[in-house]
Swiss-Prot record:
GO terms for molecular function: hydroxymethylbilane synthase activity. This is Porphobilinogen deaminase. The porphobilinogen subunits are added to the dipyrromethane group. SUPFAM superfamilies: Periplasmic binding protein-like II, Porphobilinogen deaminase (hydroxymethylbilane synthase), C-terminal domain. It comes from Burkholderia cenocepacia (strain ATCC BAA-245 / DSM 16553 / LMG 16656 / NCTC 13227 / J2315 / CF5610) (Burkholderia cepacia (strain J2315)).
Amino acid sequence: MNSETPAAGPQQAQPPATLTIASRESRLAMWQAEHVRDALRKLYPACDVKILGMTTRGDQILDRTLSKVGGKGLFVKELEAALADGRADLAVHSLKDVPMALPDGFALAAIMEREDPRDAFVSNDYASLDALPAGAVVGTSSLRREAMLRSRYPHLEVLPLRGNLDTRLAKLDRGDYAAIILAAAGLKRLGLEARIRALLDVEASPPAAGQGALGIEIAAHRDDVAAWLAPLHDPRTALAVEAERMVSRALGGSCEVPLAAHAVWRAGELYLTGRVSTTDGKRVLTAEECGAVMTVADALALGRAVSDELEAQGALDIVQALLAGSQAAGKGDA
């Protein structure tokens, strides 16, 4: 079973006695796990909720970009192993780091209310991207942001930026970069909002699918855990994220492709934007659709409509060329 959508589990007469949350050990990941832990403790005061901190391959490989070492799955495989062997009952993820298709045997049991999905401009010396002088070095961890920067600010130098949030800020503070681009949600969750000099407009820099949202993953057969997590699920966030992830999934989205998808509710309708770029930012394709979304099927249909429009503009040519180039580079590194 491979499910993107939480199923309505049976009502549990008996609350859980213990629950173990698998989490990466970075400060942001632990904040997210503690946020879920605290919510579960309020729901089930007698439950002993523990956190199992784990180091993933994605945390260990810091000298190469994710697109060159295996993509988003590097942040979740160890946590999924803990779910599979029973060491943990649930795993908490930043949804933008979760692969678009989960492995068989796993499911997203809940998607929590979203934080700010925007990208943040962080700098000690400059107020905005527009204020940066020619040749200024900007650090980013994603091809999506890199493509945006190369398209809109070709006079800037864009360099990779790896590591957890604190490591990235430390690299900025020691002068490795004039500015860095980070997800606003992580900064806000850790009380670092003062580090944000500007928030990037979603039209100029559409975020990654699921950015700002937390997803709770379980082993697919754990109907009991799904039912206990049901009160944490936010339906409006989930429908928006389902539409976004459908765009990325339909186009084979991964860390190797500069792909953005962002959905927002306006006047009862869901407005969805998808964008695919070449890594040099010279070709940028954008598609937008909106509609009344009441069910997951509606959300998936909206996502499919946006991906179809992008395909009609030639998005698959971009995706296939990038994937072929990545595979060729991988063979050369072996």
